[in-house]
């Protein structure tokens, strides 16, 4: 990706909000760590909200190493009024990053166990559904394409039928782009 961004002179925005939630045996590589040239034409966003379960604080931040790009990003944020979070959000974020290591140490094995349960259940009980291999985070993808081919349903109709007839509300993958069609997102953070 970095080579293509350089070749076509494209700025990369790397959404790294799930970067702290990585399962053992896997590694997250921040885009900005790929080298100076990659960092010159990129910026990354992240937040404590996913890792520490504090989305209500509405806090996120951008890391923009290159000065001229940083100024453009700051100007864009200023135009939409997104310049500073409130004091509670700042203090909550600082507390999460300063004192949240124990939380994260317990969260990751919990999520890994939930993922393994879902993958096992899907494999043994849901013929035609495949759990997509997962390296971290609390959102798992379930591949329903085989069922869609057999049923003749399109992704939107299938998602609607899951909600209305199956009483299961998953996030339909097609809303995340055409490659997501036929997949559904499942939040595995809850018991």
Name each model feature, range by range.
Residues 1-191:
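PLP-dependent class I/II
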């Amino acid at each position: 990706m970095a080579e293509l961004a350089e070749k076509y002179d494209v700025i990369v925005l790397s959404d790294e909000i799930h970067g702290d939630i990585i399962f053992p045996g896997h590694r997250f590589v921040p885009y900005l760590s790929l080298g100076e040239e990659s960092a010159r034409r990129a910026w990354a966003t992240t937040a404590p909200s996913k890792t520490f379960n504090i989305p209500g604080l509405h806090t996120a931040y951008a890391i923009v190493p290159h000065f001229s790009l940083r100024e453009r990003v700051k100007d864009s944020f200023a135009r939409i009024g997104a310049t500073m979070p409130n004091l509670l959000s700042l203090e909550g974020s600082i507390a999460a990053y300063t004192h949240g290591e124990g939380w994260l140490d317990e969260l990751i094995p919990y999520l890994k166990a939930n993922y393994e349960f879902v993958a096992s259940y899907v494999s043994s009980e849901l013929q035609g559904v495949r759990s997509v291999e997962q390296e971290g985070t609390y959102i798992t993808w379930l591949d329903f394409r085989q069922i869609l081919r057999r049923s003749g349903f399109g992704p939107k109709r299938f998602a609607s039928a899951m909600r209305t007839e199956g009483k299961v509300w998953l996030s339909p993958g097609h809303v995340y782009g055409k490659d997501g069609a036929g997949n559904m997102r499942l939040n595995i953070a809850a018991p």
